[in-house]
Amino acid sequence: MDLTAHAEEFNADPYPFYEALRAAGPVHRLVLGGERAWLVVGHEEAREALNHPALSKNWLGSELIEVTQVPAVATNMLDTDPPHHTRLRRLVAREFTARRVESLRPRVQQITDGLLDAMEALPGRRADLIASFAVPLPMTVICELLGVPNLDRARFRYWSGEIVAPLDGAGADPRVLEEMTAYLFELVAAKAQEPGEDLLSALIRTRDEDGDQLSPDELIGMAFLLLVAGHETTVNLIGNGVRALLAHPGQLAALRADPDGLIGGAVEEMLRYDGPVQHATYRFADTDLELGGVSIPTGSSVMVALAAADRDPARFTAPGLPGPEVFDIRRTGQGHLAFGHGIHHCLGAPLARLEGRIAIRSLLERFPGLAEDPEAGPRDWLPGTLMRGVTRLPLCW
């Protein structure tokens, strides 16, 4: 199957495609972005692939990906293997801690309230949720966290959109990568000269017990990853989550009735049911291996369909419980893969969860009559298979 031949239909609703593939087996050879790759759609096989020692994340070793004219971009945790990955994650985790994330709660709430104030003041009781709320909230949070000046944030939104839009998440225009890398080089240099209380300054300062620290290229790579991944995921979590709630009035009513008890589980179900990241980025087979009963030869490109795995009946079906195609905010025993699994599990997951819970709860409390705008017209979906979401979500209240 060539998924790109069905791009418009697939972008609008990929789940029937995944269901058909899963029914035929957990691993398939198909065409993605004009290139042949293996696609993993079963939950158990996805967990195995995400943590398989023979599946490398090193893009530079693959003929499929022609990234980087900009080496610093690839010097981040997402695109490296142990022991380099282990070292990078250890150094970053020293500063990007649960305590630091939790300390952001009051500021996230303050930013949220300000954006909702601005939405409420718009004429006609209408707004595009993506432009007015889902984008500026996580963009403001991650830029403040890293110490990016306010005037530069619009550029980051543009760069980020250009980088994640391609089908495989790696075919971005080299000029965009070069522009963003050049900016980050200047930002890191400025922080080194005049450090602040932000995370980027902390990453520049941090050293482990042996005196090891991040190199300039590694700092640029980590800033790149945190800025792009640190807001794109949350944009789509908010957008997809609100779409799911509005499409399921019973679930929306239940959440409104008991936000304290249900908001945490609701966000987890949003992540599972229609998560923000559709496919994990490519992995590459270092040796011949078997996955889901399928032989995958050395050098093959492998992509894990997180969205397919999170609707696998083999994982999410049990007697007396709703099936995986049902949106149920009271679902227990989640085990979803929206943030990945294994050594590459998303380090920013706690921040995305914090923002998602505050954003969605506050939105529902502010607008009791929230609904999709009936005059909005057809939805525009994000291109490619990396991210899952809409480019705009017109609402009324």
Predicted regions and their residues:
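Cytochrome P450
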Residues: 1-397
